[in-house]
Design a protein with these regions (language model features):
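Residue-level structural signal for beta-strand termini and adjacent loop
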Residues: 182, 206-207
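Binuclear metal-dependent hydrolase catalytic cores
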Residues: 19-201, 213, 278-308
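Compositionally biased non-globular segments, especially hydrophobic aliphatic-rich helices
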Residues: 11, 15-22, 222
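Short hydrophobic/aromatic-rich motifs at helix boundaries and adjacent loops
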Residues: 5, 38-41, 74, 222-223, ...
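Cap/insert and terminal regions of metallo-dependent hydrolase folds
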Residues: 200, 207-298
């Protein structure tokens, strides 16, 4: 398939750091640890590892099963120090404590994490409180501090007002991470854009269609948009799910309006999997660029797309 989306399924290959040779262009890659949602149907919950110059650096969400995928792919966690959480539903955060534990047991020196996630509202705690509940001094897994590498956490609770705008949260050595508020029913949620030199990928997280204008602002001209696709077009999914997720036709419209290079559909549900052709057709009503469905253990090499090219 022509286009800037280069996909390869990694079953047994290790995802380990490799040296950045002199003169080699900077690389940005995504490993899909989990492409599923809250249902148990053979996929891990939403989770991704982002590699910078071949080195795993960023964990984005940590759904149930992500821990197993990390082991299957023999991912070296030694330099993963940035954690991005789109929201605090279980299917996006259930394996976070397991990740912290595994990282501590495979590292010699102290680990300093930067963790980002939404502020709290209603039934949902702010991210700093969530992390403290898991691994703080009086947390559920406080025992973790008694063995393994020493871990410290700098947690930033991101504003959740829809008019906040795009916010830059990391800017170092060519790596830029930005976020914007989205809408996922009553659950505070954000989307992230990761840019490394001239390459960029955007993760929508779970979101309904009411705040796609914010996603467009964040994703404008990105090389790859990873959009969670958990429902069919109305009326083919339960009506209440449209208050949580964006249907395919709106995904296609959003991708077109954003001017992204490629689209990767993740967080799929069984009925979406069974209707791939219809989903693709609906998306292509608006978006003419490359579209793929994510699978667990898929590895995506981000290729920069010249402005206006497909």
């Amino acid at each position: 398939m022509k286009g800037p989306l280069i996909l390869s399924l990694m079953i047994a290959a290790a995802v380990t750091p490799r040296a950045q040779a002199s003169g080699v262009k900077p690389s940005l890659e995504v490993v899909v640890l989990g492409s599923g949602g809250p249902r148990a149907f053979g996929r891990a919950g939403s989770s991704y590892i982002v590699l910078i110059d071949g080195k795993p650096r960023i964990l984005l969400d940590a759904g149930p099963g992500a821990f197993v995928r990390i082991g299957e792919l023999n991912i070296d966690l030694g330099q993963v120090d940035i954690v991005l959480l789109t929201h605090l539903h279980i299917d996006h955060s259930g394996d976070l404590a397991a990740f912290f534990n595994a990282r501590a047991l495979t590292s010699d020196g102290p680990i300093k994490y930067r963790v980002f996630g939404p502020d709290g509202a209603g039934l949902f705690p702010k991210t700093s409180r969530f992390v403290d509940w898991l691994v703080g001094e009086n947390g559920l897994f406080a025992y973790q501090k008694s063995f393994g590498a020493q871990e410290t956490f700098s947690v930033r609770d991101l504003a959740i007002e829809l008019n906040t705008g795009v916010t830059k949260i990391v800017d170092e050595n060519g790596l830029i991470v930005e976020e914007i508020v989205t809408h996922h029913g009553d659950c505070p949620s954000v989307a992230y854009r990761i840019t490394y030199h001239d390459k960029s990928v955007v993760f929508s997280g779970d979101m309904d269609a009411s705040a796609v204008s914010n996603l467009v602002r964040l994703a404008t001209s990105a090389d790859l948009l990873v959009f969670n696709c958990a429902v069919l077009d109305p009326p083919d999914s339960p009506s209440q799910l449209y208050e949580l997720h964006t249907p395919p036709k709106k995904i296609g419209e959003t991708a077109k309006e954003s001017g992204v290079g490629s689209l990767l559909l993740s967080h799929t549900a069984p009925d979406v999997e069974e209707s791939k052709n219809a989903v693709m057709k609906s998306i292509h009503t608006f978006f003419t660029g490359p579209v793929e469905f994510a699978t667990d253990r898929m590895r995506v090499q981000i290729t920069h797309r010249p402005q206006g090219a497909h």
